[in-house]
C-alpha cells in the first residue's frame, strides 16, 4: 500500500470512529470489522471488510467504494439509490429503497426487494434461500434465476416458469392467473386473492391457502398440513381429504364435513 493511500485510509478510520464510536481494525491493508455493525453508511471508510452483517441507518445516502460484507447487507428504508459495482455481500435487503438496478450474476443467500423501485431482476441471479419481490413492479422472473422460496404478494408478477420446485411460494394478491405446470412446493402455497381458477393435478404442496379465489374444485386424496378456503368458490371438499392442522373455511355452500374427511381442527 502506498503511503498516500495508507494515510487516507487511516484518516477515514479515525473519522468513522469519531462519528460512530465503533473501533475498526486493519487487516490485509484494509479497514476490518468483525461482528454486527450498525452505522450511517456515509461514514464508512472505503474498502471496508465486514466479517459479519451491516445494518445501515435510515439517513444513509451512499455506500463506500470496495465494501465487502460477508453476511447480510441491510440498506432497507435508507436513502441509498445505487449499489456500487464493486460492492460484495452474502445477502441483501434493499426493501423500501429507490434502487432501480442490480448487477448481473449475483449469487446470494437471500434477496429482499420489498416495496423498492426495482422493476426487473438481473440476469443470472442465484438465491439459495428467500427471494422477495413483494409490492414491486417486477412482472416476470428470468428463466435463469434460481431461488428456493418466493415471496411475491401484492406484486405485478404475471407468470412463473414450469417445473419449479420450491420450499415456499406466496403470490397472494398478485396478477398471477394460473399456476405453472409441474409446480412442487414443499411447504406453504399461498394463492389467496388472485384470479387463479384451478390447481393443476400435477401441482404438489404441503399447505394450501386459497382464500377469495374462483377455484371450484380440489383433487381427491389430498394430505395437507393446513387448508384455508375462506370465501372461495369451492362448493364441496374433495374425497379422502386429510388436514393435520387447520381447515379454515367460511364457505356457506359447505355445511358439513364428509365422512371420509379427517381434520384436526376447524
Predicted regions and their residues:
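Intrinsic disorder/low-complexity segments enriched in polar/small residues
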Residues: 3-7, 18-20, 66, 72, ...
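Hydrophobic anchor residues at the C-terminal helix/turn of individual leucine-rich repeat
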Residues: 66-67, 86-87, 105-106, 124-125, ...
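Structural boundary micro-motifs
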Residues: 3-12, 69, 127, 176-177, ...
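Concave beta-strand-loop units of leucine-rich repeat
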Residues: 33-39, 52-60, 71-79, 88-98, ...
Amino acid at each position: 500500500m502506498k503511503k498516500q493511500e495508507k494515510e487516507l485510509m487511516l484518516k477515514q478510520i479515525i473519522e468513522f470512529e469519531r462519528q460512530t464510536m465503533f473501533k475498526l481494525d486493519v487487516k490485509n491493508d484494509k479497514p476490518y470489522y468483525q461482528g454486527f455493525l450498525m452505522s450511517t453508511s456515509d461514514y464508512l471508510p472505503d474498502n471496508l471488510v465486514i466479517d459479519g452483517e451491516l445494518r445501515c441507518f435510515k439517513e444513509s445516502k451512499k455506500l463506500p467504494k470496495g465494501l465487502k460484507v460477508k453476511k447480510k447487507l441491510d440498506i432497507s428504508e435508507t436513502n441509498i439509490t445505487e449499489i456500487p459495482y464493486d460492492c460484495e455481500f452474502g445477502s441483501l435487503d434493499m426493501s423500501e429503497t429507490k434502487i432501480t438496478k442490480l448487477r448481473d450474476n449475483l449469487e446470494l443467500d437471500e434477496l429482499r426487494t420489498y416495496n423498492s423501485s426495482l422493476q426487473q431482476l438481473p440476469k443470472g441471479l442465484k438465491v439459495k434461500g428467500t427471494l422477495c419481490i413483494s409490492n414491486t413492479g417486477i412482472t416476470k422472473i428470468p428463466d435463469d434465476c434460481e431461488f428456493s422460496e418466493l415471496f411475491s404478494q401484492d406484486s405485478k408478477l404475471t407468470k412463473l416458469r414450469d417445473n419449479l420446485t420450491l420450499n415456499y411460494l406466496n403470490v397472494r394478491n398478485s396478477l398471477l392467473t394460473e399456476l405453472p405446470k409441474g409446480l412442487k412446493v414443499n411447504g406453504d402455497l399461498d394463492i389467496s386473492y388472485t384470479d387463479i381458477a384451478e390447481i393443476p393435478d400435477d401441482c404438489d404442496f404441503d399447505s394450501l391457502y386459497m382464500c377469495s379465489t374462483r377455484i371450484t374444485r380440489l383433487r381427491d386424496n389430498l394430505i395437507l398440513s393446513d387448508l384455508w378456503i375462506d370465501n372461495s368458490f369451492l362448493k364441496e371438499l374433495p374425497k379422502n381429504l386429510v388436514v393435520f392442522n387447520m381447515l379454515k373455511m367460511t364457505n356457506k355452500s359447505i355445511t358439513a364435513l364428509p365422512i371420509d374427511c379427517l381434520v384436526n381442527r376447524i
